[in-house]
Amino acid sequence: MSKIKAISLFSSAGIGELLLNNTNVDVVAANELLPKRADCYKHFYPNTDMHCGDITLDETKEYMIASAKKHGAKMLIATPPCQGLSTLGKNKKQIHYEKDKRNYLILSAFDVIDNCDFDYILIENVPTFLDMYFPYEDDYFKLEEILNKRYADKYVVEARVLNAKDYGICQSRPRAIIKLYKHGLKWAWPVSEEEIPLQDAIGHLPSLESGESSDIPWHFAKVHNDRTVLALKHTPTGKSAIANEVYYPKKEDGTRIKGFHNTFKRMQWDQPCPTRTTFSGSMSSHNNVHPGRLLPDGTYSDARVLTLLETFIVSSIPENVDFPKDSTDTFIRTVIGESIPPKLMMKVIEKIGESVQLCQ
């Protein structure tokens, strides 16, 4: 069976597409604004036509439309930045209409959709994306409303929030999934699975302290400052060092660092990993510290954030992934934090062609 050709907009580094080779979809062209991310995408997918440019510009849209037509692309994958209005106020009709639609990048995808004949369209983002309001026809609407107004005659429009932890991924990471597919075609939702606790996912890897490395690729610990390491050594699994009475996070001058209850916090072994954000390399950010294990001296091991290997595993990224040689730890963590876990993308896309009844 021939593969469905697809184009990808707002593709970033292509993390979300890493497992699409296991599906019936082949991404033939992609667009990304930022050169470093576009270069990483080209590194991962040398056979895909990556166009680095601004999708709000006519020339970029025209390039992607031409590429879609050239390759006979029948699918669009779009992961636009989450931009919109979170509230409208009481007098929605009186709100000034944004004349510059470039502030709402998802609307730029409409020009591509209108000029191509896609069978399937996948739009994914953070859950709040479904609650945002966007300017349309001199008013403001949620995206699902706009899609129905514009495309209901041609497409079935469905939207759900799926959490990666329910689909074979050891990470609690909710993502908004919007599917459009032509009337007469089929596209089921993926079937939920048992949660995977962190122990089962990364518990086999050797313990590491701040700055230590191993002979396992990507399994090396970031260097953290001694004050924070000391505080976390005295912080049990699942707890935050912020709550410690003696060994709490301190500034250089010794004063206590104030923070939320989920900062400087260790994860739980018996639960999926918390969401990996773009700040997963910082112990001071939310829920980022390795669970650790109780040591004979009463302290806890692994006073550090997850290694890149551990981050790959809980993000469903292949352990043998080959990032460009000049990729920094921060860059890798950032593009992972921006992306849908690739296994969740795969699970959604592999249901193309299946009827809804099969997965109920």
Regions found by a protein language model. Give the residues of each.
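Short, solvent-exposed loop/turn segments at secondary-structure junctions
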Residues: 14, 35, 81-83, 127-129, ...
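Short alpha-helical patches at coil-to-helix transitions and adjacent helical residues
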Residues: 13, 140, 175, 338-346
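Aromatic-acidic/polar surface patches that form glycan- and anion
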Residues: 9, 30, 102, 136, ...
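Core alpha/beta nucleotide-donor-binding catalytic domains of modification enzymes
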Residues: 2-116, 126-134, 138-140, 145
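Class I S-adenosyl-L-methionine
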Residues: 65-70, 85-263
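C-terminal target-recognition/interaction regions appended to catalytic cores
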Residues: 226-360
